[in-house]
């Protein structure tokens, strides 16, 4: 007997062998029903839901009747006679509810009244019947052919749903969900999974995958030099030169830039080292010059190398009294590798033991022949302290710029390089970008490294708001979704959706690169652990005040890798050291380095409880020297900081002597007159010094405990505002063991 599905227009007679009705036999009657005109039963009589060729509605055959319907137009059920509900040919019985072919007997489940919402009960009441259900033979599911698995590698996007993954690979969704569950991933068919997870699952099924690269990536800038080389010469116009100042630590780089800009930036730098990257423009004779100032000394900073790549001219600062130093030589290497012209600025000519000729001879020995010695490298003698011959240096820069004819296309979509980035507590991600080609405008959609955004605000180094920035202009921008890396390329994108897709791909790659092993050690026991073969890698969590410092420190630490141990930064970020950072250090056995960054109280307590090693620095050279000595077993006794108390600045007022008195509330520990004080703003160190005065009311005191208020003057420092935090500490001598 062939299986078939009965439509609403098919005859009940034709389907009799396949369908059993809820009614009875041939008699009329209620649930039973013979041939009489019963209710839900159903022969050929005029019933509604029954269903032959009568005029039924949804169920019917060829007639126009209600749902079901026999050949006559009657009510539900019905045989041939006109009887009322009940059996036989008269009112009543018949063969009863379970009789004949239709009753509640053994094949009740095959009744057409058992499907969906259309049901007929034994009392003769009917409900709307929309679909006729067939026998088990008819209900057999249709055979579905399994999806064909592709041959060869398949391309998968950065993220996809389980359903999309199933369709792409030909693996059933249920199998994929089971495999994900075994891998520890609880998902549903609409859940998003990333490429790494999909590739692992695909490999379990013997399927090779490759990452899909969108066609839009073809227009993505990876090298700015390629962008400039691709410009039509007819579209190029002159632009200001971009100058980077390089040189040995304390040779006066920031002092020189300070003299050029006539500001006091140099006074705030720790140990003579520029800790923040800056980008500034100055003007001479109506022409602009852009200066980049990068952190630390060239020996250990990647930003110096990046600066040489984005710069047109390098001013190499050499002190007339110190001469050429190791970091001077490494700066020369950066310049030569970048292939940019160099100008030597011999600084500190006002020093008593200054000897410019000796400096020129040392430079010649290093392969830098100045013009006075018959070479092609200009040299200018200056005094940043006395601001002597500064204009002469600027004129030399403009002369070199004229010889090299620096140009860009101001009408192209903007492309530039990030020189500094940080997370501002009130403004969000803030980045300084040097526009190198095109014009950057407000409301431009941009792709910056692994993040995206829309330019909402833009201003120059003087704080003036701008609507656009032309080539060689440094600007601070707001509107990014995350903090980019120093050295990332900014590119204007026509479609923000495409930019986000590309940023997502880059984030995935960064996660892969950041993966590290979970073994680490404290700095004190580093050499001993290396000798015993306990570790092969030193895990570091790095927190700094700005993004540019992170890049500089990362490059510095990368120079310290040896065959015995590799340094691996498992996490980096800007701002306060948090409890999350400490928890990561606990799990990965890492040490935490705070560069001008301090822990919050919760993080400090967590670190003390679990013995997490947190080191604080404000000079990159000291940081690298400590780790280098630890790795070779040459650590000497140190003075370790012991934090004794914290206080919150509630108010400030100025004395007639111009000193600022900070009104404090001691929140933790105690303050003692002999302690050192560190002023923190938003978790970042802005001053480290000594206590000049400590008072309660008008009386000098030696100590103030937690829960009390006091007045305090910081020696030689007045930039204190309400909301700042003060940390009080002492130093104790500690013998290091290896």
Curated annotation (Swiss-Prot):
Region ranges (G4): 347-350
Segments for region (G1): 247-254
Entry superkingdom: Bacteria
One Gene Ontology molecular-function label: GTP binding
A Gene Ontology cellular-component term: cytosol
Biased composition (Low complexity): 121-143
Region named G3: 293-296
Annotated binding of GTP, by residue: 247-254, 293-297, 347-350
Alphabetic keyword roster: Cytoplasm, GTP-binding, Initiation factor, Nucleotide-binding, Protein biosynthesis
Biased segments, Gly residues type: 22-102
Keyword Nucleotide-binding belongs to the record: yes
Compartment list: Cytoplasm
Membrane-traversing stretches: none
Region of interest: G5: 383-385
Biased composition (Polar residues): 1-10
Location, primary (coarse class): cytoplasm
Pfam family, one: IF2_N
InterPro entries: EF-G-like_DII (IPR053905), EFTu-like_2 (IPR004161), IF2_II (IPR044145), IF2_N (IPR006847), P-loop_NTPase (IPR027417), Small_GTP-bd (IPR005225), T_Tr_GTP-bd_dom (IPR000795), TF_IF2_bacterial-like (IPR000178)
Residue numbers spanned by region Disordered: 1-150
UniProt-listed NCBIfam families: IF-2, small_GTP
PANTHER family assigned to the protein according to its UniProt record, in alphabetical order: TR-TYPE G DOMAIN-CONTAINING PROTEIN, TRANSLATION INITIATION FACTOR IF-2-RELATED
Family as reported in the entry's similarity comment: Belongs to the TRAFAC class translation factor GTPase superfamily. Classic translation factor GTPase family. IF-2 subfamily.
Functional note: One of the essential components for the initiation of protein synthesis. Protects formylmethionyl-tRNA from spontaneous hydrolysis and promotes its binding to the 30S ribosomal subunits. Also involved in the hydrolysis of GTP during the formation of the 70S ribosomal complex.
Protein's recorded name: Translation initiation factor IF-2
Annotated source species: Roseiflexus castenholzii (strain DSM 13941 / HLO8)
Taxonomic lineage: Bacteria, Bacillati, Chloroflexota, Chloroflexia, Chloroflexales
